[in-house]
Amino acid sequence: MSCSYYGKCAGCNLNLPYNDEISFKTDFLKSEFKEFYQGEIEIFKSDEWNFRNHAEFGIWHEKGDVFYTMRGNSNERVKIETCPKMDKKIVEMMPKLLQNLRENKNLKERLFGIEFIATKFDFMAILLYHKDIFNIKDDLAKLAEILDIKISARSRGKFLNFGGEILREKVQNFIYRFNADAFFQSNTKVNEKMILFVLNAVKNGKDLLEMYCGHGNFTLPLASEFGKILANEISKNSIKNARENSKNKDNINFVRMSAKELIDAFNGVREFNRLKDIDITDFDFSHVLVDPPRAGIEPEVLDFIQNFKNIIYISCNPASLKQNLQILCETHKITKFALFDQFVHTEHIECGVVLQK
């Protein structure tokens, strides 16, 4: 592995040639899920380097100087200058930003972390402080001007933005906007492959229910495959961005509701003002798409989605996926299984599973 920090920094824990790494992950999935699926696993590889568009680094203070750090294998902090996994824009910006911080006492004082976000259109550095950021407002504004990037500063629930707080990314032919604190895929190329996998999983689509939709990562491309889409998300900012992202699509309905609230609405347990303009009885669902957090799908949601003929499940945690499949495979059969290698040089695995009754 061509990184001088491997073995010291805990950011990577697999030191294998890339094809061997893919074999390691594939063999793990075959063994872990053999009771549910014995077919071929579709493999979607990543670039080995410069694939990550989003990361946070610690800041270490020593004798008036500052350094980037990562957590070490023994929980100590490891000084680093760069990270070869990062997008090239981040790699280029890291030393420039650090030099400007070193030259400005106000900016480096009580700074404890920096988060970088690089998209095809925007670049943002988020500076994390243990002090009143309003006292360094002018310094931050000047920093954004010098580096010609978006700068955000945060401390104790307060924040300042210079250059705008919205980021834009192009995935396939779609433009997505999102806030810096929203969840978004950190490997854009593999995300595009995930979207293609989902698109190819749709046959004879009528209407789609999408749960945990975020800012519409899958929703926008899927709009052309279905008559109508109903998509839920609990995050207010994500729903706001999803609606903005889909303003040219007239067959998508986004609702800010939890999965359990949406199920209550379908079951007639409660009426929700948020659904007053949407007739949920007017949908003819052929598919449900779920992309839950690491904890997986809640029991009541599992019971609910078993009513659908076709389930598309995107998982960021094989352990919770396996638990959920114990239930789903009582009524459904897996027809496709995919490995998305979002995080190269780590044991992290993301999966896509298609189930049918």
Swiss-Prot record:
InterPro entries: MeTrfase_TrmA_AS, SAM-dependent_MTases_sf, TrmA_MeTrfase, U5_MeTrfase_fam. GO terms for molecular function: rRNA binding; tRNA (uracil(54)-C5)-methyltransferase activity, S-adenosyl methionine-dependent; tRNA binding. S-adenosyl-L-methionine binds at Q185, Y212, N217, E233, D291. The active site is at C316, E350. Keywords: Methyltransferase, S-adenosyl-L-methionine, Transferase, tRNA processing. CDD domains: AdoMet_MTases (cd02440). GO terms for cellular component: cytosol. It holds the Pfam family tRNA_U5-meth_tr. SUPFAM superfamilies: S-adenosyl-L-methionine-dependent methyltransferases. PROSITE patterns: SAM_MT_RNA_M5U, TRMA_1. It catalyses: uridine(54) in tRNA + S-adenosyl-L-methionine = 5-methyluridine(54) in tRNA + S-adenosyl-L-homocysteine + H(+); uridine(341) in tmRNA + S-adenosyl-L-methionine = 5-methyluridine(341) in tmRNA + S-adenosyl-L-homocysteine + H(+). It is an enzyme of class 2 (transferase). GO terms for biological process: methylation; tRNA processing. Its EC number is 2.1.1.-, 2.1.1.35. PANTHER family: TRNA/TMRNA (URACIL-C(5))-METHYLTRANSFERASE (PTHR47790), TRNA_TMRNA (URACIL-C(5))-METHYLTRANSFERASE (PTHR47790:SF2). Belongs to the class I-like SAM-binding methyltransferase superfamily. RNA M5U methyltransferase family. TrmA subfamily. Dual-specificity methyltransferase that catalyzes the formation of 5-methyluridine at position 54 (m5U54) in all tRNAs, and that of position 341 (m5U341) in tmRNA (transfer-mRNA). This is tRNA/tmRNA (uracil-C(5))-methyltransferase. It comes from Campylobacter hominis (strain ATCC BAA-381 / DSM 21671 / CCUG 45161 / LMG 19568 / NCTC 13146 / CH001A). The lineage of its organism: Bacteria, Pseudomonadati, Campylobacterota, Epsilonproteobacteria, Campylobacterales.
